[in-house]
């Protein structure tokens, strides 16, 4: 069908970008940027909890489902269970949390749109690369997006509740008349 040497090279690049070593480098750079450049402190806790929690959740789900990887037309070899895709979960976690944290620092609609478009492209390209390379079924990737999306939403919800309580504690107490 769609297989070609050039496309295979591109898909291997996206798979590499979604691999653990790349996610670690992207995460370390992001932590430095959030801390040193944007002077974020509490956001680091959110970022770390999402980035650390996503692979833990992935491993738990793989142990729960025990789904074998596709055994036909693999372009790369990999071991372990298939569902959910760890690359899809990592991509959704990293680019999702970065979009959430960077959104408020981008003043223009064009800049925000670019942030979201780049994030969506990276998330989709990494997931599609796993299907193309024959190491995941489409449902593995979709399940990875869903699991990571749930984890991201829960973590952001707790973070926002924490921020609201912190803000309420800083407000001066209004005297009753």
Regions found by a protein language model. Give the residues of each.
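Hydrophobic alpha-helical bundle signature of multipass membrane enzymes
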Residues: 1-81, 98, 104
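Membrane-embedded catalytic cores of phosphoryl/pyrophosphoryl-handling enzymes
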Residues: 71-177
């Amino acid at each position: 069908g769609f297989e070609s040497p050039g496309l295979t090279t591109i898909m291997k690049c996206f798979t590499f970008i979604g691999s653990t070593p790349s996610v670690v480098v992207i995460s370390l750079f992001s932590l430095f940027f959030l801390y040193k450049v944007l002077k974020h402190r509490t956001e680091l806790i959110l970022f770390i909890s999402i980035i650390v929690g996503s692979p833990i959740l992935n491993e738990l789900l793989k142990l729960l489902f025990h789904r074998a990887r596709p055994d036909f037309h693999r372009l790369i070899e990999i071991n372990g269970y298939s569902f959910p895709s760890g690359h899809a979960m990592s991509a959704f976690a990293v680019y999702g949390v970065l979009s959430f944290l960077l959104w408020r620092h981008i003043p223009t609609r064009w800049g925000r749109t670019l942030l979201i478009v780049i994030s969506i492209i990276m998330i989709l390209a990494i997931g599609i690369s796993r299907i193309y390379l024959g190491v995941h079924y489409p449902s593995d990737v979709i399940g990875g997006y869903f699991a990571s999306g749930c984890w991201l939403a829960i973590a952001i919800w707790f973070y926002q509740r924490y921020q609201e309580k912190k803000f309420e504690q800083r407000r001066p107490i209004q005297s009753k008349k």
